[in-house]
């Protein structure tokens, strides 16, 4: 039992503070009293102290003297420049004949020193100078000692593979000759974890010598260059018996020249007549700047209906840590392969068109690993607008284009959210939410988002669904054997709507299944069994189940 005694006048002050009176032992009671005294000091009662203590049976009695509350006489700016004071939140009126609050001074000190640390002065210090006390008022002036200007030296890198110091310095923002910035040091670990082709073998260290700061890194090569092959065995809907074999090849080369670049080639054979090719080139820190350049080309042949080609150019800027602001442009063109039959002088479900769009995006994540994610959250947003031009096809009657606006504005929005929650050492709960929207009065099937298959709605053929707006939620549980081997159970639930000019559609789709992923000495093997059901395709049918094999080699 804790009993705090004060004078009758000070008891009025003490009533404003809540403190527990019941404690398991005297040590915890003493800690509660110290916390109370510290709070009184922070609120301006600088002379508050414990005068005496007596312990009687289970009761601890303390006599506390609170004293007078101090106020500012005046806190002058001293030698601190006005621009720095404004950044710290300092206002003269807050420190002139106002109650003295220690936390207010501490916040200002932290803000000033943080600004100094970010601008080349890691050894800056702040103190109160010309201190004077008149009765219960305090007067002082600020005295900021910046210390020596510190510049970054070149990175000291010890690695067992080719990694150019100039590239890594630009990527980390630690450029030789630039002012020291504590934020770059704070973000160092996370930024290095985002590089999939290396592993930090020892904690980084920082040394200061001759007004220069040197960051020492020791990293090892991580085998992440990939050659992935997936074979799928699906029932062939065009034949009463037999299987349709689909395939996919993914080649990703990361850091091929020691400067962080990425080269990718991805090919898919989705059905007998459908194939897709994607090429990617990523160039980080162009000309030593914080800008990253990505170029992508995608080509799709959809059955005997149409071909589609997309050129994408993206420039991203690192906002700090793992936040990126993106600006991108896209040039999209699609052409009919054959001429569909026209029976009612209306446009077919696919048309020839060109679309040039521009947009902005934002990416952020705090994943614990770029590939083998077991903890963290990430999301990205994209929005774009562009001019769409429908081209007249000479194989179609001119009447089908009457009343059709051939030049329109088209809007596209994308959202992708992922969360990996590690509930126990060997169990991870994965939540994902994806969504997309295309807005235009002139939308056709070759405008649509394509969903279905191993990377979107499992239990369905690859790119089975066409949608101009969709929402996809994934819930997945993983039982880990190690960081790269696990059993999984999953569900994919999607709402899909196609607001096409010719024939609007809507559907709900659900995919359920289980799988296994395990690592070998040369790669990772994946096996997934999935069932799919939707309003338009009917209930779950084991005869239409999907089996996916995958093997990823890394070198």
Give, region by region, the residue ranges found by the protein language model.
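Periplasmic polypeptide-binding modules associated with outer-membrane biogenesis and secretion
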Residues: 1-8, 16-237, 246-250, 264-273, ...
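Internal, well-ordered alpha-helical segments in soluble enzyme and binding-protein domains
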Residues: 108-112, 354, 358, 413
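Well-ordered beta-strand positions
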Residues: 132, 318, 517-519
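Short helix/loop capping segments that flank catalytic or ligand/cofactor-binding pockets
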Residues: 152, 227, 370-371, 389-391
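Short acidic/His/Gly/Ser-rich catalytic and metal-binding motifs that mark active-site loops
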Residues: 163-167, 335-339, 388-393, 442
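Gram-negative/organellar outer-membrane beta-barrel architecture
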Residues: 181-380, 451, 464-467, 524-555
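C-terminal transmembrane beta-barrel domains of outer membrane proteins
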Residues: 246-250, 264-269, 273, 278-280, ...
């Amino acid at each position: 039992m804790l009993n705090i005694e004060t004078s009758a006048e000070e008891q009025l002050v003490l009533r404003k503070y809540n403190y527990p009176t019941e404690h398991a032992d005297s040590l915890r009671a003493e800690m509660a009293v110290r916390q109370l005294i510290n709070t009184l000091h922070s609120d301006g009662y600088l002379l508050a102290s414990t005068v005496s203590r007596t312990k009687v049976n289970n009761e601890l009695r303390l006599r506390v003297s609170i004293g007078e509350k101090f106020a500012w006489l005046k806190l002058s700016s001293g030698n601190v420049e006005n621009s720095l004071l404004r950044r710290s939140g300092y206002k003269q009126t807050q420190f002139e004949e106002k109650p003295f609050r220690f936390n207010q001074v501490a916040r200002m000190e932290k803000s000033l020193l943080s600004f100094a640390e970010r601008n080349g002065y890691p050894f800056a210090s702040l103190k109160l100078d010309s201190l004077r006390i008149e009765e219960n008022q305090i007067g002082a002036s600020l005295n900021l000692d910046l210390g020596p200007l510190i510049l970054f030296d070149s990175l000291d890198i010890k690695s067992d593979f080719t990694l150019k110091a100039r590239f890594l310095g630009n990527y980390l923002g630690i450029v030789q000759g630039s002012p020291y910035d504590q934020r770059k040091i704070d973000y160092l670990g996370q930024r290095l974890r985002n590089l999939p082709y290396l592993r930090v073998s020892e904690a980084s260290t920082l040394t200061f010598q001759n007004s220069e700061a040197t960051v020492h890194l020791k990293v090892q090569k991580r085998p992440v260059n990939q050659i992935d092959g997936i074979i799928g065995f699906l029932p062939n809907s065009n034949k009463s018996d037999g299987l349709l074999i689909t395939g996919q090849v993914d080649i990703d080369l990361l850091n091929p020249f020691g400067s962080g670049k990425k080269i990718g080639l991805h090919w898919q054979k989705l059905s007998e007549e459908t194939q897709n090719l994607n090429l990617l080139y990523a160039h980080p820190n162009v000309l030593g700047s914080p800008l990253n350049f990505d170029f992508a080309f995608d080509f799709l042949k959809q059955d005997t209906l149409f071909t589609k080609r997309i050129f994408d150019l993206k420039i991203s800027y690192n906002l700090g840590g793992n936040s990126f602001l993106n600006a991108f442009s896209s040039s999209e063109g699609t052409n009919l392969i054959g001429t569909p039959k026209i029976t009612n002088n209306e446009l077919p479900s696919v048309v020839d068109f060109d679309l040039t769009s521009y947009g902005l995006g934002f990416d952020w994540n705090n994943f614990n690993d770029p590939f083998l994610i077991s903890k963290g959250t990430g999301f990205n947003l994209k929005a774009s607008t562009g001019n769409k031009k429908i081209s007249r096809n000479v194989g179609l009657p001119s009447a089908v284009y009457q009343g059709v606006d051939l030049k329109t504005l088209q809007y596209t929005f994308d959202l992708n959210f992922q969360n990996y929650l590690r509930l126990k050492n060997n169990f991870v709960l994965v939540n994902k939410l994806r969504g997309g929207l295309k807005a235009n009065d002139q939308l056709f099937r070759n405008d649509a988002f394509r969903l279905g298959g191993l990377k979107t709605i499992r239990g369905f053929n690859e790119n089975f669904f066409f949608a101009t707006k969709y929402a996809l939620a994934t819930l997945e549980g993983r039982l880990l054997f190690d960081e790269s081997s696990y059993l999984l159970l999953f569900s994919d639930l999607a709402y899909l709507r196609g607001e096409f000019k010719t024939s609007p559609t809507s559907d709900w789709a659900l995919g359920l299944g289980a799988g296994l992923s395990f690592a070998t000495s040369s790669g990772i093997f994946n096996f997934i069994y999935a069932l799919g059901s939707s309003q338009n395709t009917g209930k779950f049918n084991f005869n239409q189940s999907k089996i996916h094999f995958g093997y990823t080699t890394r070198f």
